[in-house]
């Protein structure tokens, strides 16, 4: 029993050291700025997000990325609140915001994936940039993610954090940070195991190559 305990402890320590070493490897992979800017399509799936979607739209409208190289496509996934009205108003004011109304489910696909698939199919950008309707993003979000995609083989997994000051929010933040750190550690060795859809970008041609979420 003691031998098994030592063996498990040794394996766990090797696992932790592997992650830590991977985190430091990211320092050598600086993002290179590309002077030739690609068109970026931001895609969002929203369902009953009347309390959050306006804040996200505000952030997206204040990006440093050139507006003529940007489009925002938001798929309203059968919302029963005022999400649709908010999206209609935003699309009427800003020509590069597009509102897609999802009326039916796809029995072979999760509802969010179906909504995202519909949005991506309408995208005209070379780069797809994903976030969630209840997220907030900094002004340099599009610029940094788009540059990173071109420097990292066509896909970039961004960092996200959970906001809030309650005990539950803080607990979630620590739990999510540990998962993200482990994934980033493996990523330093070029073996990412997952990517959160709330901060993810990739080249559209790669999405088309694998036939999307089907």
What annotation goes with each model-predicted range?
Residues 1-36:
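N-terminal membrane-anchoring/stem segments of glycan-assembly enzymes
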Residues 15, 96-119, 144-214:
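Long helical/loop segments within the catalytic core of UDP-sugar-dependent glycosyltransferases
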Residues 22-31, 49-63:
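Short, well-formed alpha-helical segments that are part of the catalytic scaffolds
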Residues 38-41, 71:
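Cell-envelope/extracellular polymer assembly enzymes that use nucleotide-activated donors
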Residues 57-105:
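Acidic donor-binding segment of Leloir-type glycosyltransferases
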Residues 77, 124, 131-133, 214:
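Active-site acidic Asp-centered loop
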Residues 82, 131-148:
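Acidic donor-binding/catalytic loop of UDP-sugar-dependent glycosyltransferases
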Residues 91, 114-127:
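Active-site nucleotide-sugar/metal-binding loop of Leloir-type enzymes
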């Amino acid at each position: 029993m003691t031998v098994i305990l030592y063996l498990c402890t040794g394996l766990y320590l090797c696992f932790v050291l592997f992650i830590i070493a991977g985190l430091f490897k990211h320092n050598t992979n600086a993002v290179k700025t590309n002077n030739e800017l690609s068109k970026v399509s931001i895609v969002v799936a929203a369902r009953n997000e009347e309390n959050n979607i306006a804040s996200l739209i505000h952030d997206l409208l204040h990006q440093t990325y050139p507006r003529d190289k940007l489009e925002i496509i938001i798929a309203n996934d059968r919302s029963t609140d005022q999400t649709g009205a908010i999206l209609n108003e935003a699309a009427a004011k800003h020509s590069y915001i597009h509102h897609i109304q999802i009326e039916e489910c796809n029995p072979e696909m999760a509802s969010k994936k179906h909504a995202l698939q519909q949005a991506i199919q309408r995208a005209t950008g070379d780069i797809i940039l994903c976030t969630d309707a209840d997220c907030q993003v900094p002004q340099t979000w599009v610029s940094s993610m788009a540059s990173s995609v071109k420097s990292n083989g066509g896909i970039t997994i961004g960092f996200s954090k959970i906001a809030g000051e309650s005990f539950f929010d803080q607990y979630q933040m620590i739990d999510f940070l540990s998962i993200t750190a482990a994934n980033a550690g493996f990523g330093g060795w070029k073996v990412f195991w997952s990517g959160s859809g709330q901060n993810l970008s990739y080249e559209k041609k790669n999405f088309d190559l694998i036939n999307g979420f089907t």
